[in-house]
Amino acid sequence: MTTPFVLAVPSKGRLQENADAFFGRAGLTLAKPRGARDYRGTITGLDNVEIAYLSASEIAAQLARGQVHLGITGEDLVRETIADADKRVMLIEGLGFGYANVVVAVPQAWIDVRTMADLDDVATSFRVKHNRRMRVATKYINLTRHFFALHGIVDYRIVESAGATEGAPASGAAELIVDITTTGATLAANGLKMLDDGMMLRSQANLVASRAADWTPEARETARVILDHIASRARAAKYKEVRTCLPGCDAALLSEIEQHFGALAPFGTPPAGGILTLHCPPAQLYPLGTLLRARGAETVSIGSLDYVMARDNPLFSRLEAFLGA
């Protein structure tokens, strides 16, 4: 029996909803044939694919171990969980959801502390004054150590946080924190501020590939099909389709259209009296339509694109280069 291709997807909440919607837009419908509470699923129409519904943190761990081929998880968890991440996994595509910034935040009462250099001064004076190191509450232990080392800060110790990290300074459990934030509102509500240069990582949900997975020829072909769907949808999302008939259309006009509007003619110059098809960025639709009518078009129709399939599969080409022969 062929070993299944395993795609790991977040098991609950907005991440799962967004992941399901992302694959659905790409024409890949995730299904749970044995019921909504099952933690295994399939992709409709793709044989030998197993969907593993896991927590985002467990997905990162299983990618590291090679137990899944592809997975959706946050870059913050990839960088925190996987040592030498760029050698062991590949961030194939940012998915446009699950945004979070990993930041260094200190009490607002520290009015003279605005940068990591200021924090270094505080760390040194804190140890002299209190005969102990200042405490940093976080669940991002590895990211914190790396970032603080880059800034030459050594006089601190990490207090591991399981949750509600932003409350640690107020409770006396730590002097400052490293945590995720989107708007900064929760930090402010807890009397904290982000340092001016305290942005450690801008994270979002990513489609990630594991180098250590069993990449048989069958697994690579499955990945090719999945990534072709995703790339086709991504191409379509960038353009609208413009169709018209022109009394005269030549290569010079198409070059002008591409140069001024970023619009492409995927099928080239039409024959005399034929329909010209263009793919145009949405922001340039009206100016392009104005030009086409000025050049003799009686009607210009504009429609949405579901998928734009091309011979190229850039996502899979990058994966192949990462995996090697």
UniProtKB/Swiss-Prot annotation:
Its main location: cytoplasm. It is found in: Cytoplasm. It comes from the Bacteria. GO terms for biological process: L-histidine biosynthetic process. GO terms for cellular component: cytoplasm. Its cofactor is Mg(2+). This is ATP phosphoribosyltransferase.
